[in-house]
Structures are given as structure tokens and as C-alpha cells.
Amino acid sequence: MASKKVCIVGSGNWGSAIAKIVGGNAAQLAQFDPRVTMWVFEEDIGGKKLTEIINTQHENVKYLPGHKLPPNVVAVPDVVQAAEDADILIFVVPHQFIGKICDQLKGHLKANATGISLIKGVDEGPNGLKLISEVIGERLGIPMSVLMGANIASEVADEKFCETTIGCKDPAQGQLLKELMQTPNFRITVVQEVDTVEICGALKNVVAVGAGFCDGLGFGDNTKAAVIRLGLMEMIAFAKLFCSGPVSSATFLESCGVADLITTCYGGRNRKVAEAFARTGKSIEQLEKELLNGQKLQGPETARELYSILQHKGLVDKFPLFMAVYKVCYEGQPVGEFIHCLQNHPEHM
């Protein structure tokens, strides 16, 4: 069997952390081609191109400083050139950019290429919810899997122990992806409920914004625990309404579910920015620049998409926590009123 060529589409904080793992494994395992391409959105860093810095210093100095990437990971500034020979495409870009990237890649991929999405977010289609893996799969005509879990990028790059979940309908492909990405400190469970795994990854960012509001307002640990639990209930309810495939509670007990929700509500960037938003009154855009090096936050954007989908279906009242995050972020509702969505939650009626 010919060795599989791998391309990582994206090179932010999480993309670079995954490149470190995938590059290391591809160099050692016969089933993969050792040369791993990584598409890098070209930027100028102190008069040098970011791709040149990565290919000479083997470090993404902007998005994952202090971590060496394996020398077999090659940064390529042209997405078509990076992806055209790949058998496996790993998608890891902010979800608002995926449509444009798919438009560029369409018609340029190998006939038997497959993809895996590490992107946390949802898209609103004309008929309501669209998962990012569906968007990619439909636009590029390739089978898609997903990887979601309690994986804060800097900790993964530091090789601190964590778990993650791959959702893949084809068991053989799931096993291949596990071989490509598993390490002693990055442990993977493969499940077949792709939709549920992916929806967990998108929705938890909205809950984390709520958790950040709690922290910024000084509400304490009991309130934050309630936000996490009520958020989980809304996640499960939303999945049961909108996933086309089966939705079992067991999937929410995997790393993609409750574990990712907890880590994001205590350690992730959505929580951090939401806390600063509640404390300072600065805009989300301003805080993205100050705290995230200009990287985009997924939680508020996902809340906006959820609002659009739920309003279309007449179900806004069933998801008060999701809707409160939307209203605070986009409609100018005072952040201090966030507590009302908890006090009047349908879970308690």
C-alpha cells in the first residue's frame, strides 16, 4: 500500500500544535509519507515571511512560539499547492474562513482524498444548521471525519496528557486517523456518531462565554457549575433536535462532550475574553486584538448562528443560556442581566 500523504490546512495555534504531533508520527510510521505539508496564511513578521521562518527555524513564531515543529512539516503559502497531492486533509482554520478555502480547493484534490475537521463551529444554511464537516464534504466531494476534545492547544504542544474523540463512520478510516494522531500523551477514542461529536465542539464555546461572564461578574464557583450543567443540557437538547444521525448521551461523556466543556469553561480563550468583556466593557473585537493576537473568537459567532437557526424554528425560548450569550454579545443587553437566564431556566420549571 502506498504511503498516505498528509496536508494540514491551517497553521494557527491549534493547527501548529497538531502539526507537531502529525509530523512526528508521519516521520516514524510506514503507512504515511514523511513529508507533511501545512498551509500557512502568509504574513510578514519583522520583514520576513512566516512560511520562511517556519521552514528555516521550524517554529511558528506568531501562533505557537517556543515550540519546535518537526523538520518534515513544510509550510506552503498556496493552499492548492499544499493540498493537491494529499490523501488526508486535516482542516484546522477559524470556521468563518472555511467556505472561501473550499472554493479555492474545489477541483484540485486527489480523487480518493479524505478529510478530518478539527474546526469548532456551525454554519447556518438556508434550511438551518450545517456542520462544518458537512460544508467541507459537500463543497469538496470528500468523506469527512471530525476530531474534538478537551484540547487546549498550548497544553497539547507542551505534551501534557489529554484525551480526544474522533467521530468517523468508517471504522478502518477511524483507525488510520488514530494511528496518524495518537501519541502517549494524546489519547484517542473513535466513535461513529460524527454529528454529535462535532456539535459538542461547536456549542461548548457558547457555554464558555457564559462561564467567562460569570467569572467577570464575580459570581463564584457554584454559579459557574450551574452554567456548565445548564449549558450541557442545552447542548444535548440542541443535538437531539438538529442532528440527522442518532444522538446518544454516552457520546457526551466522551472527551468531546463534558471534558471539553469543562476545560473550555475554565481554561479556554472564549472564557478569558468573556471575563475581560464583563470586567472592562471593551468590545469583543478590541479584546480579540489585545488578548488573542487578533485571532477570531468562536463562541460569540456561534451564538449568533444559533440565534438565527433557533429563531427560524421558533425555539428561542427553549435555549435561554445560548440566547443570553447572543443578546449580551450582539444586542447590547447588559452583561449583569446574564444571571436572569439561569434563574428562569426551563430546567427548573
UniProtKB/Swiss-Prot annotation:
NAD(+) binds at G10, S11, G12, N13, W14, G15, F41, F97, A153, R269, K296, Q298. Its EC number is 1.1.1.8. It catalyses: sn-glycerol 3-phosphate + NAD(+) = dihydroxyacetone phosphate + NADH + H(+). It is found in: Cytoplasm. GO terms for biological process: cellular response to cAMP; cellular response to tumor necrosis factor; gluconeogenesis; glycerol-3-phosphate catabolic process; glycerol-3-phosphate metabolic process; glycerol-3-phosphate shuttle; positive regulation of glycolytic process. GO terms for cellular component: cytosol; extracellular exosome. It is an enzyme of class 1 (oxidoreductase). It is linked to Hypertriglyceridemia, transient infantile: An autosomal recessive disorder characterized by onset of moderate to severe transient hypertriglyceridemia in infancy that normalizes with age. The hypertriglyceridemia is associated with hepatomegaly, moderately elevated transaminases, persistent fatty liver, and the development of hepatic fibrosis. The modification N6-succinyllysine is found at K289. NCBIfam families: glycerol3P_DH (TIGR03376). Has glycerol-3-phosphate dehydrogenase activity. Homodimer. Keywords: Cytoplasm, Disease variant, NAD, Oxidoreductase, Phosphoprotein. The modification Phosphotyrosine is found at Y326. Substrate binds at K120, R269, N270. Expressed in liver (at protein level). PROSITE patterns: NAD_G3PDH. The modification Phosphoserine is found at S154. Inhibited by zinc ions and sulfate. This is Glycerol-3-phosphate dehydrogenase [NAD(+)], cytoplasmic. Belongs to the NAD-dependent glycerol-3-phosphate dehydrogenase family. The active site is at K204 (proton acceptor). It comes from the Eukaryota. The keyword Chloroplast does not apply. GO terms for molecular function: glycerol-3-phosphate dehydrogenase (NAD+) activity; NAD binding; protein homodimerization activity.
